[in-house]
UniProtKB/Swiss-Prot annotation:
NCBIfam families: PRK03996.1. Its main location: cytoplasm. This is Proteasome subunit alpha type-5. Transmembrane segments: none annotated. CDD domains: proteasome_alpha_type_5. GO terms for cellular component: cytosol; nucleus; proteasome core complex, alpha-subunit complex. The proteasome is a multicatalytic proteinase complex which is characterized by its ability to cleave peptides with Arg, Phe, Tyr, Leu, and Glu adjacent to the leaving group at neutral or slightly basic pH. The proteasome has an ATP-dependent proteolytic activity. The keyword Nucleus applies. It comes from Trypanosoma brucei brucei. The lineage of its organism: Eukaryota, Discoba, Euglenozoa, Kinetoplastea, Metakinetoplastina. SUPFAM superfamilies: N-terminal nucleophile aminohydrolases (Ntn hydrolases) (SSF56235). The 26S proteasome consists of a 20S proteasome core and two 19S regulatory subunits. The 20S proteasome core is composed of 28 subunits that are arranged in four stacked rings, resulting in a barrel-shaped structure. The two end rings are each formed by seven alpha subunits, and the two central rings are each formed by seven beta subunits. The catalytic chamber with the active sites is on the inside of the barrel.
Length: 246
């Protein structure tokens, strides 16, 4: 039996007497140390965006990516440990392709979130067999896409929970971003309004100046049903438009 909180800290498969698994709680706290990412669902599209932190001038910015494609119609943006995210995203990609091959149809956005969370809970050791990870995944994903049910935005977290949102933010600036969402977001937003709100929030929560190279933005429109990651010129136009709006 564990006799102290410190010993419960080390156990990833054991609840404390208060009903808590501390390692999962610590993984959720680790996400708050990551850069801010957010997503907005509108009737015509779902938009995801992220703060892009380049740790050094010697780093090639093109190698730092927070928005990733899972399938043609699904993209994700992350906050937390990038290496952990890569494992989850690679798993989601394989599941999406297996679904397409087996059923001759694209995977639903919710099923993609579920597949990701199925892997999220495969940590620790049990029955003498080592799991994929010895600890919880220290990353949260916002999974955005369009399927037969329209545009959708889902969040996953280290506990294996997945939840659908109209608008959501994760990472260091999540609390401030969610305050703005509660004041400015409405379900009938146009794509242009959602883009402007995205830039406005990132401008407020980022420590560095917001530029076309310091953020990433992507969209999955209902009209095409395909993920489109904006280039720097498109991002600059949104930044300029939002500045004029203010």
């Amino acid at each position: 039996m564990f006799s102290s909180k410190t010993e419960y800290d080390r156990g990833v498969n054991t609840f404390s007497p208060e009903g808590r698994i501390f390692q999962i709680e610590y993984a959720i706290e680790a996400i708050k140390l990551g850069s801010t990412s957010l997503g907005i669902q509108t009737p015509d599209a779902v938009i995801i965006a992220a703060e892009k932190r380049v740790p050094s001038t010697l780093v090639d910015p093109s190698s730092v990516n927070k928005i990733l494609e899972i399938d043609h119609h699904i993209g994700t943006v992350l906050s937390g440990m990038v290496a952990d995210a890569r494992i989850l995203v690679d798993h989601a990609r394989v599941e999406a392709q297996n679904h397409r091959f087996t059923y001759d149809e694209p995977m639903s956005v919710e099923s993609c979130a579920l597949a990701t969370c199925d892997l999220s809970v495969q940590f620790g050791e049990s029955g003498g067999r080592k799991k994929l990870m010895s600890r919880p995944f220290g990353v949260s994903l916002l999974i955005a896409g369009v399927d037969e049910n329209g545009p959708q935005l889902w969040q996953t977290d280290p506990s294996g929970t997945y939840t659908r949102y109209d608008a959501q933010a994760i990472g260091g600036g999540a609390e401030a971003a969610q305050t703005v969402f509660s004041e400015r977001y409405h379900r009938n937003m146009t794509v242009e309004e959602a883009e402007n709100l995205t830039v406005q929030i990132l401008r407020q929560v980022m420590e560095e100046k917001l530029t076309k190279t310091s953020v990433e933005i992507a969209i999955v429109p209902v009209s095409t049903g395909r993920l489109q990651i904006y280039d720097q010129e498109q991002i600059q136009r949104i930044i300029d438009r939002q500045a004029e709006e203010n």
